[in-house]
Amino acid sequence: MLFLKRSYRIFIFLISLFAYAQISVASESISIGTLDQDALFRNSLFGKRVLQEVSDESELLLAKELSLQSELETEEQSLTVKRKTIGTEEFIKLAAAFDEKVQKIRSETTEARIKLNKYSDEERNRFFQIALPILVQLSEELGLSTLLDHRMVILSLKNITDIAVDRVDKVIGNGREIISE
């Protein structure tokens, strides 16, 4: 009986050692890296091009909006002056036409902003679709088994964002040469 107890203890000890060895080997083979996706896009040539295009278009839209606002204010003042010299029915027609014009301009402005935001989102998505194989290859080269977004990690010793920006820039540049599908 004593022999069985002793054998059992040795068996348990050996199983524990084996399990510990397996855990140690497994933990050594798992290498996790982090990536700042926003920084990758923002700092890449592709992302810089898209952000500049969106910024330029936003400035054009703002300038157009300010110009239209100035025109509408002038037209509104003119309508206010006319109100004193024209009949009520004619004023109501002019006011309704002015209101319709304002609503149309607001609608067009909103539509232009939505279109610009959609373009920005689509280009960002396209960038990550193109960059994914590059990130996979880079992860393999660095021996990473997992790549996480930096926002999901409390501490990381292996952030590959800067390396990824360099690699993506070398492969896809600013993205103008890539034919969209």
Residue ranges of each PLM-predicted region?
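Bacterial N-terminal signal peptides that target proteins for export
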Residues: 2-11
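Bacterial N-terminal signal peptides
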Residues: 11-20
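Sec/Tat signal peptide C-region and signal peptidase I cleavage site
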Residues: 20-26
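Amphipathic, charged alpha-helical segments and their helix-to-coil junctions
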Residues: 26-181
